[in-house]
Amino acid sequence: MGKKQTKPINAKSRSESNVVADPRFQSVHSDPRFSRLKRGNFKVKVDERFKSLKEDKDFKTTASVDRYGRPLNQDKATKEIDRLYELENEGSSSSSESSEITDNEEVASASSKSTKSEELTDEESEDEEVYDPARGEGIISTSESSDESDAESETEAQPEISELAGIEPEENIPRGSETNRLAVVNMDWDNLQAVDLFVALSSFCPPGGKLLKVSIYPSEFGKSRMAAEHVQGPPRDIFTPADNQPSSAELHEAQKFGFDNNESDQDEEDALIEEDLGNEFDMVKLRQYQLERLRYYYAVVECDSVRTAKVIYETCDGAEYETSANIYDLRFIPDDVTFDDDESREVCTKAPEKYEPRDFVTDALQHSKVKLSWDAEDPHRKDLIKKAFTSQDIEDLDFSAYIASSESEDEDVDVIRSRYQKLLSGDADDFQANSNPFEDDDKLEGANGEMEVTFTSGFDVDNNANSSEKDETTIEKYKRKAAERKQRRKELRQLKKTKDDEGEGSDVDLGFDDPFFKDKDASRNNKKNKKGKHTQIEDPTAASKEELENLVREDENDSEQLDHFDMKSILKAEKFKKNRKLKKKASNLEGLQEGFEADVSDPRFAALYTNHNFALDPTNPHFKRTKTVEKIMDESRKRRSNQLEQTQDGKPELKIKKRKAEKGDQRQELDRIVKSIKRSGK
């Protein structure tokens, strides 16, 4: 019997009775959005890379039982994969296989034995664990054959990688005899200083050992390269040529996607905001150049003994300096090698108290994208600018490494000295008004003509005088001003001494015409004397000997001084007098001044009774009741009572009446205003 014919799924093959003839839905029959998919289109087609999808057990692992504990069919996972996935060449191969079945029956029977053996080997290989890093399964093979193959592949790939990175193959350099000096080579000297090496290597010294000095010298290779870079800049090989056109393969790829060669050029505006991808450099040559910069300098480490140098060599050689990707490359220096002829870049003999290492990474040793460091800013200078210094740090800091000299390098020092000597020892007759002492003598001799006199304002003179002050640092400016103030005070003291010695009528010129050093009070007195309106003011501090004797005189009749009393003794005596037993002790106390009586009517102490600041408060805990205090309080009461008697003439009462009248007038005026507002509102 033939196969049962099924109705086609396509809408065109349907019977006319099922077709909707409504013109509103006419587009449904032709619109692909409403057409049904074919069964073959349900499957996802995969290429040969995913051929193991149907064979690998990892894609077919399912649960052995369902959620109710019933056993599941293990072929369900295989059927599910066949239903969803299909290889690209599977559809075409299925038709060809059906036609060739009859021809290959004999071949299949003959090769059945071989296939069985292959299946056995496949099953054995499947039982073995396979290394799959994606799933984290399997064990790395450690057989000798794999090691040999890996070694061969590494040896084949190593020259290519080193050549691509610009790294020269390692040389077998002999270690040599052990000495107390070590050389450090192949380091990033743009970021490393002698202090960094001194501190880092000092931490590896054995007990009792120490570093004496770390010096950094330029190598012969570095001297020649730096001299060439000073004139010509970095080598041209590191830059890509300007006429670098895309290759034929790139053009073919661009034309394949519909891009024209002219469209690849960007506008100027796009170039301004274009990201720096390093396309202007040849990365291989740039990396090689950056690695060559590691050989521009070398460091010499001097230890106190051979034992210390040996320990540092064995510990640090081949280790990384912090996280900078720089590897210590240490060599012993023979004793007969000297560095007296070489000029060191920097020397460190002592670790600073507050040391902070710099965090840096050498891109040429670690990153795929290398940056050119030839024109980079000095990283130590950047740290110096950002750091907040104390006054002691500023004094200890050496600015000579970061500030250029004020004198020109091309100018001879002897010529400058001779010019200054001409300025100091030259006569006024020989000096020309329009000549410059810093010009060459040949120019001065050739300048013949009339003398031209020019006048400059005082502002220009002050600006020229203060030009040197602008170049001063903060500390130098502070010290200079302090010295000027000290000198000014000294000159003022000398001026006063000379005035006292010579007298007021002396007209001797002291050599000071500056108005700053003149006494303001003296100038005022001189002006008044010239006008004749005022006489010269006498010094109020001058006192005669008689007045001083009166202030400290002693009473001839009394043995004690007039101002001699002891307040503590007086308070004790007042307390002892209240107790009969202690009355005798009160008479033995000194400094009582028993015969002294205060003159409460003295006008000099009138403020005690009028000023509230001197009012006495008996409730205050610091109040001390004595005879003199009680006398003062009685006097204040008398004066207050006298003031009340003097007010009987009625003046205070009149003031009170006036205030009451003023308040009444204000109330009447307010009532009038309220009434007027009410009338206007009606």
Curated annotation (Swiss-Prot):
The modification Phosphoserine is found at S117, S125, S506. It comes from the Eukaryota. The modification Phosphothreonine is found at T121. InterPro entries: Esf1, NUC153, RRM_ESF1. GO terms for biological process: rRNA processing. It holds the Pfam family RRM_ESF1. Its main location: nucleus. One of its GO terms (cellular component) is nucleus. GO terms for molecular function: RNA binding. It is found in: Nucleus, Nucleolus. Residues 478-491, 525-534 have a biased composition (Basic residues). Residues 1-32, 55-176, 457-564, 634-682 are annotated as: Disordered. Residues 120-131, 145-157, 501-512 have a biased composition (Acidic residues). Keywords: Coiled coil, Nucleus, Phosphoprotein, Ribosome biogenesis, RNA-binding, rRNA processing. The keyword Cell wall biogenesis/degradation does not apply. Residues 76-86, 468-477, 515-524, 544-554, 662-674 have a biased composition (Basic and acidic residues). Residues 90-99 have a biased composition (Low complexity). Residues 471-597 form a coiled coil. PANTHER family: ESF1 HOMOLOG (PTHR12202:SF0). Involved in the 18S rRNA synthesis. Required for the early cleavages at sites A0, A1 and A2. Belongs to the ESF1 family. This is Pre-rRNA-processing protein esf1. It comes from Schizosaccharomyces pombe (strain 972 / ATCC 24843).
